[in-house]
Amino acid sequence: MPFKKINLLILLTIIISLTVLAFSQTSPPRTASSGVNGWKKLTTEPFRGKQDDVFFVTPDVGWYVNGSGKIYKTIDGGSSWALKLNKPGTYFRAIGFIDQQRGFAGNIGTNYFPNVTDTTPLYETSDGGETWKPVAGVTEQMIKGICAIEIVKKPFINAGKLDYKATIYAGGRVGSPAFLLKSEDNGASWQSIDMSRYCQMILDVKFFDEKNGVISAGTDADVQKSNALILTTGDGGKTWTKRYQSNRPYELTWKSSFPTRKVGYITVQNYNPDKNATERVVAKTMDGGKTWKEILLVNDFNVREFGIGFIDEKRGWVGGTMSGYETTDGGKTWKPVEMGKAVNKIRLLKTENGFVGYAVGIDLYKLEYLNK
């Protein structure tokens, strides 16, 4: 790797590290409290920095992961959490489960963040997260690191019972290289797809079924040259089509949310040091990812976007540097809401009477909404 490229990657790493450190130093103690908009901060173990992913299989059973190599589990909707894995040197960036027993956790890999020594890209559990082991046959040659895990379940009849066949995708990573893992047999075997002809960074992966999917990406490993990029596939990841590319440097798309098959939103991250570059935008599609338009989130140089989640086509949230943002009109207008700092992932699950939401960043927040 050229010396200049290494220096630029180190610079980006330092910027991200200093940013999340600043968040953590101003973060209050982690005790349960209520936000004015209904988001409630849950009691969790203190962590200095941005935590990256949370996943729930039911409104009550879920897990979250962070960069210190820890995986936590709750069975009571976040009222209490149990530490299930503590693996220093591992940076868990993503987590996903097929059901309450079988799941996967992705590691960012080495040569990006400091103090990360684990080269194992992907871990798995078959007992609800009580124990974890490296996924057999998946090496760093297949994928250097993982930023997102997506699981698509298709129902089928198995010996007279309704069962599910899972197709699993794991993509990465920030800073390059760009690879996509795919399993079509519940994680028993894996194939690696080299994405370097299409993009240089993969930040999020969304699939609607086994064939049709969307990737949030960056055009260049050098962030000062990178444009935000969105790709789609209709053949299970064999080929990809560019659907959106920003015309600004220092950008990449970060996280996605599709409340319906047609309507979707993706955060556009901006690292431009020019203080005149103040617009922060979200990409929106209304035709399933074929075309995209930019909608203004906020005009503020100090804001960086992270996670995003929409419960329907109109109402959703974006995690920002110091607070979150909420819209109830499909992104036409946004208002600040207290849901934690640097929220990197928002998970929303529908319930009988409404929905429940979880948002992880510096802290972990929960929203319970009942239909009127």
Predicted regions: what they are:
Residues 66, 106-109, 170-173, 216-219, ...:
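Recurrent small/Gly-Pro-centered beta-turn motifs in extracellular repeat architectures
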Residues 347-372:
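Blade-level signature of beta-propeller repeat domains, shared across WD40, Kelch, NHL, RCC1
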Residues 43-68:
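Beta-strand-rich domains and repeat architectures in extracellular enzymes and scaffolds
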Residues 50-53, 91-96, 143-151, 200-206, ...:
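Repeated scaffold domains used in trafficking and secretory/extracellular systems
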Residues 110-114, 174-177, 220-223, 271-274, ...:
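Short glycine/acidic-enriched loop and turn motifs that connect beta-strands
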Residues 30-43, 69-85, 121-138, 181-194, ...:
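Asp-box/BNR beta-propeller loop motif
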Residues 299-323:
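Loop/turn-rich, solvent-exposed surfaces of beta-rich toroidal or solenoidal domains
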Residues 61-63, 101-105, 160-169, 211-215, ...:
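Entry beta-strands of beta-propeller and related beta-repeat scaffolds
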